[in-house]
Curated annotation (Swiss-Prot):
Biased composition (Basic and acidic residues): 33-44
GO biological process assignments: translation
Keywords: Ribonucleoprotein, Ribosomal protein, RNA-binding, rRNA-binding
Keyword rRNA-binding annotated: yes
Location of the region described as Disordered in the Swiss-Prot/TrEMBL record: 32-62
Protein name: Small ribosomal subunit protein uS14
Gene3D superfamilies in alphabetical order: 1.10.287.1480
Function noted in UniProt: Binds 16S rRNA, required for the assembly of 30S particles and may also be responsible for determining the conformation of the 16S rRNA at the A site.
Pfam families named in the record: Ribosomal_S14
Species name: Verminephrobacter eiseniae (strain EF01-2)
GO terms under cellular component: cytoplasm; small ribosomal subunit
Assembly and oligomerization: Part of the 30S ribosomal subunit. Contacts proteins S3 and S10.
Protein backbone atom coordinates (compact mmCIF):
# COMPACT_ATOMS: atom_id res chain seq x y z
CA UNK A 1 0.00 0.00 0.00
CA UNK A 2 1.42 3.38 -1.03
CA UNK A 3 1.63 6.20 1.46
CA UNK A 4 -1.49 8.32 1.57
CA UNK A 5 0.60 11.45 0.94
CA UNK A 6 1.85 10.07 -2.39
CA UNK A 7 -1.67 9.22 -3.51
CA UNK A 8 -2.90 12.69 -2.50
CA UNK A 9 0.01 14.32 -4.33
CA UNK A 10 -0.98 12.46 -7.48
CA UNK A 11 -4.60 13.60 -7.11
CA UNK A 12 -3.39 17.17 -6.70
CA UNK A 13 -1.41 16.82 -9.94
CA UNK A 14 -4.52 15.53 -11.74
CA UNK A 15 -6.48 18.59 -10.64
CA UNK A 16 -3.72 20.96 -11.79
CA UNK A 17 -3.45 19.25 -15.18
CA UNK A 18 -7.22 19.55 -15.65
CA UNK A 19 -7.20 23.19 -14.57
CA UNK A 20 -4.48 24.27 -17.02
CA UNK A 21 -5.21 21.78 -19.84
CA UNK A 22 -6.68 24.29 -22.32
CA UNK A 23 -3.97 26.87 -21.77
CA UNK A 24 -1.25 24.21 -21.97
CA UNK A 25 -2.54 22.86 -25.31
CA UNK A 26 -2.85 26.37 -26.79
CA UNK A 27 0.65 27.39 -25.76
CA UNK A 28 2.15 24.11 -27.02
CA UNK A 29 0.42 24.61 -30.39
CA UNK A 30 1.77 28.15 -30.73
CA UNK A 31 5.28 27.17 -29.62
CA UNK A 32 5.41 24.31 -32.14
CA UNK A 33 3.90 26.22 -35.09
CA UNK A 34 6.69 27.09 -37.55
CA UNK A 35 4.42 29.56 -39.38
CA UNK A 36 4.30 31.88 -36.36
CA UNK A 37 6.88 34.59 -35.78
CA UNK A 38 9.83 33.94 -33.50
CA UNK A 39 8.54 36.49 -31.00
CA UNK A 40 5.16 34.74 -30.74
CA UNK A 41 6.80 31.35 -30.31
CA UNK A 42 9.17 32.69 -27.67
CA UNK A 43 6.25 34.27 -25.80
CA UNK A 44 4.43 30.93 -25.87
CA UNK A 45 7.51 29.14 -24.48
CA UNK A 46 7.77 31.70 -21.69
CA UNK A 47 4.07 31.20 -20.99
CA UNK A 48 4.65 27.45 -20.69
CA UNK A 49 7.49 28.06 -18.27
CA UNK A 50 5.26 30.21 -16.08
CA UNK A 51 2.69 27.44 -15.67
CA UNK A 52 3.06 25.32 -12.52
CA UNK A 53 5.37 22.34 -12.99
CA UNK A 54 2.68 19.88 -12.00
CA UNK A 55 0.36 21.28 -14.69
CA UNK A 56 2.43 19.30 -17.21
CA UNK A 57 0.62 16.02 -18.02
CA UNK A 58 3.91 14.11 -18.33
CA UNK A 59 4.46 14.47 -14.58
CA UNK A 60 1.40 12.33 -13.82
CA UNK A 61 1.90 8.74 -12.77
CA UNK A 62 -0.64 5.95 -13.23
CA UNK A 63 -1.44 4.38 -9.87
CA UNK A 64 -3.55 1.43 -8.78
CA UNK A 65 -7.01 2.61 -7.70
CA UNK A 66 -7.00 0.27 -4.70
CA UNK A 67 -3.42 0.15 -3.41
CA UNK A 68 -1.84 3.22 -4.99
CA UNK A 69 1.00 1.11 -6.41
CA UNK A 70 2.78 3.11 -9.15
CA UNK A 71 4.32 0.22 -11.09
CA UNK A 72 2.70 -2.71 -12.84
CA UNK A 73 -0.55 -0.82 -13.34
CA UNK A 74 -2.78 -1.83 -16.24
CA UNK A 75 -4.46 1.17 -17.90
CA UNK A 76 -7.47 -0.88 -18.98
CA UNK A 77 -8.40 -1.68 -15.39
CA UNK A 78 -6.63 1.05 -13.44
CA UNK A 79 -5.35 -1.67 -11.11
CA UNK A 80 -1.98 -3.16 -10.25
CA UNK A 81 -1.20 -6.60 -11.65
CA UNK A 82 -1.43 -8.28 -8.24
CA UNK A 83 -4.90 -6.84 -7.60
CA UNK A 84 -6.07 -7.85 -11.08
CA UNK A 85 -4.94 -11.40 -10.34
CA UNK A 86 -6.70 -11.48 -6.96
CA UNK A 87 -9.92 -10.03 -8.32
CA UNK A 88 -9.89 -12.27 -11.42
CA UNK A 89 -9.53 -15.41 -9.31
CA UNK A 90 -12.32 -14.21 -7.04
CA UNK A 91 -14.53 -13.62 -10.09
CA UNK A 92 -14.86 -9.88 -9.47
CA UNK A 93 -13.80 -8.90 -13.00
CA UNK A 94 -16.31 -10.16 -15.58
CA UNK A 95 -14.92 -11.94 -18.62
CA UNK A 96 -11.49 -12.65 -17.11
CA UNK A 97 -10.53 -16.29 -16.71
CA UNK A 98 -7.28 -18.08 -16.01
CA UNK A 99 -5.52 -19.07 -19.22
CA UNK A 100 -5.44 -22.75 -20.02
CA UNK A 101 -4.36 -24.47 -23.23
Amino acid sequence: MAKVALIQRELKREKLVAKYAKKYVQLKAIAGDAKRSDAEREAARLGLQKLPRNANPTRQRNRCAITGRPRGTFRQFGLARAKIREMAFAGDIPGITKASW
